[in-house]
Amino acid sequence: MNSIEFPLVDRTTQNSVISTTSNDLSNWSRLSSLWPLLYGTSCCFIEFASLIGSRFDFDRYGLVPRSSPRQADLILTAGTVTMKMAPSLVRLYEQMPEPKYVIAMGACTITGGMFSTDSYSTVRGVDKLIPVDVYLPGCPPKPEAVIDAITKLRKKVSREIYEDRILYQQENRCFTTNHKFHVGHSTLTGNYDQGLLYQS
């Protein structure tokens, strides 16, 4: 046998030998065991709960919900993320082992939703805190859309090269800042300004 060339496979062992790369083998094993950490804060998470039932059966994708971030490799964020909860979400993400993935589920998670215009305590998009792999719009998204997002994430995982992902994560790290709110003195006295009532 020539050590420089690949060994020839005869007809008897041809059906029992699989040739692959270590990267493809790693991607295949991760496809079969995406373990999500569920981070739900409002109504989108209730819609996600229907996936656990027999109708949608998300166990067929190898999804086993975990309660510890150290055992999870996927975090599903659903619902409004407030400034008070933002450090907890970042801490959960940082405790997850590499490679880790994020699915942002629902309008409130992606853009802040209806709370983004007049609420000072809402994070206007979870991608300002952690890197997001798949965006899932809707208010709330249907379970079929969640299955589609998981399928798209599985396609992304199957095509990625591990070394490229590590370099990408080192270049595009998300850093958070401490938000400081300045409380001003109230100008409200409890009385109506009669001049404002009769202006035309």
UniProtKB/Swiss-Prot annotation:
Its EC number(s): 7.1.1.-
MF terms in GO: 4 iron, 4 sulfur cluster binding; iron ion binding; NADH dehydrogenase (ubiquinone) activity; quinone binding
Membrane topology label: Peripheral membrane protein
An example Gene Ontology CC term for this record: chloroplast thylakoid membrane
Cofactor note: Binds 1 [4Fe-4S] cluster.
EC supergroup of this enzyme: translocase
Coiled coil (residue ranges): none
A GO BP annotation: electron transport coupled proton transport
Cofactor names: [4Fe-4S] cluster
Subunit field text: NDH is composed of at least 16 different subunits, 5 of which are encoded in the nucleus.
Functional summary from the UniProt entry: NDH shuttles electrons from NAD(P)H:plastoquinone, via FMN and iron-sulfur (Fe-S) centers, to quinones in the photosynthetic chain and possibly in a chloroplast respiratory chain. The immediate electron acceptor for the enzyme in this species is believed to be plastoquinone. Couples the redox reaction to proton translocation, and thus conserves the redox energy in a proton gradient.
PANTHER family according to UniProt: NADH DEHYDROGENASE, NADH DEHYDROGENASE [UBIQUINONE] IRON-SULFUR PROTEIN 7, MITOCHONDRIAL
Protein name, UniProt field: NAD(P)H-quinone oxidoreductase subunit K, chloroplastic
Naturally occurring in which organism (per UniProt): Buxus microphylla
